[in-house]
Amino acid sequence: MATPLFFTDNAVAKVRELIEEEENPDLKLRVFVTGGGCSGFQYGFSFDESQEEDDTVIERDGVKLLVDSMSYQYLVGATIDYQEGLQGSQFVVQNPNASSTCGCGSSFSI
């Protein structure tokens, strides 16, 4: 079986904080890949209450991360992190499958 995604402590803590702010314990973080961006593919993040039949679920410390089957093939082995810096705060994907990424890090190519 392929190596699943890794969900860092920072990402888990931020997702938990956002779910608590929304006061909806059914929310899960969905990570997906779409076509676009300057390198061909880009990452997307959203909160979702529903889990689809073909979703891969990564659960850590009570927080769930969902990935649809199409996106999963591009994200196998990736690390989902949350970083705060001078240029703002954001979820970041460290993807070993990406052959190149754009300068902003939000799009990639295989």
Curated annotation (Swiss-Prot):
* Positions contributing to iron-sulfur cluster binding: 38, 102, 104
Which family is it part of?
Answer: Belongs to the HesB/IscA family.
* Cofactor binding note from Swiss-Prot or TrEMBL: Binds 1 iron-sulfur cluster per subunit.
Source organism (scientific name): Marinobacter nauticus (strain ATCC 700491 / DSM 11845 / VT8) (Marinobacter aquaeolei)
Sorted alphabetically, the keyword list is: Iron, Iron-sulfur, Metal-binding
Q: Which Gene3D superfamilies match?
A: HesB-like domain
* UniProt GO BP: iron-sulfur cluster assembly
Its required cofactor(s), as named, are:
iron-sulfur cluster
Record's protein name: Iron-sulfur cluster insertion protein ErpA
The gene designation is: erpA
* An example molecular function term from Gene Ontology annotations: iron ion binding
- Function statement: Required for insertion of 4Fe-4S clusters for at least IspG.
